[in-house]
């Protein structure tokens, strides 16, 4: 289940995000391909929204797409993201945004592997990563 909505003013977002995160997450920017640290990440764990911390993707669904951005064939739960039509730059794409805070994550395409056939192409700067061990420690504190 998605967590309670996070609402902040743009000034508040600017205070808590780096300039690059703000550009991508709040202004729908795109990082350069192959530039993000999570593109190369092979550890087991969970990818969370860099703005609000909501869990979005599992390392179990990450795959090598060759595009230069972290790619996943599925989300942890369909209520974690919202899909929006994006016709910017004279293209027809589907934008992926965090359902909790509305931040831009990337786009989803219909050219991914089985079992979904989807490729969630996500900006590395839009994500944080928690290893399986960090996730277990968080559960123990609850």
Swiss-Prot record:
GO terms for biological process: protein repair; response to oxidative stress. Its EC number is 1.8.4.12. One of its GO terms (molecular function) is peptide-methionine (R)-S-oxide reductase activity. PANTHER family: METHIONINE SULFOXIDE REDUCTASE (PTHR10173), METHIONINE-R-SULFOXIDE REDUCTASE B1 (PTHR10173:SF52). Keywords: Metal-binding, Oxidoreductase, Zinc. Binds 1 zinc ion per subunit. The zinc ion is important for the structural integrity of the protein. The active site is at 121 (nucleophile). PROSITE patterns: MSRB. HAMAP family: MsrB. One of its GO terms (cellular component) is cytoplasm. It catalyses: L-methionyl-[protein] + [thioredoxin]-disulfide + H2O = L-methionyl-(R)-S-oxide-[protein] + [thioredoxin]-dithiol. Residues 10-132 form the MsrB domain. Belongs to the MsrB Met sulfoxide reductase family. The lineage of its organism: Archaea, Methanobacteriati, Methanobacteriota, Stenosarchaea group, Methanomicrobia. Its cofactor is Zn(2+). The keyword Oxidoreductase applies. Zn(2+) binds at residues 49, 52, 98, 101. It is an enzyme of class 1 (oxidoreductase). Pfam families: SelR (PF01641). This is Peptide methionine sulfoxide reductase MsrB. It comes from the Archaea.
């Amino acid at each position: 289940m998605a967590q309670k909505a996070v609402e902040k003013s743009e000034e508040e977002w600017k205070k808590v995000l780096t300039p690059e995160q703000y550009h991508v997450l709040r202004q729908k920017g795109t990082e350069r391909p192959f530039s993000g640290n999570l593109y190369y990440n092979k550890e087991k764990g969970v990818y969370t929204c860099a703005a609000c911390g909501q869990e979005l993707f599992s390392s179990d669904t990450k795959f090598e797409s060759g595009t230069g951005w972290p790619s996943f064939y599925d989300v942890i739960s369909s209520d974690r993201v919202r899909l929006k039509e994006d016709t910017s730059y004279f293209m027809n794409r589907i934008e992926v945004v965090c359902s909790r805070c509305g931040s831009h994550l990337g786009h989803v395409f219909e050219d991914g592997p089985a079992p979904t056939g989807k490729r969630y192409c996500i900006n590395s700067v839009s994500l944080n990563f928690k290893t399986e061990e960090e996730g277990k420690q968080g559960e123990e504190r609850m």
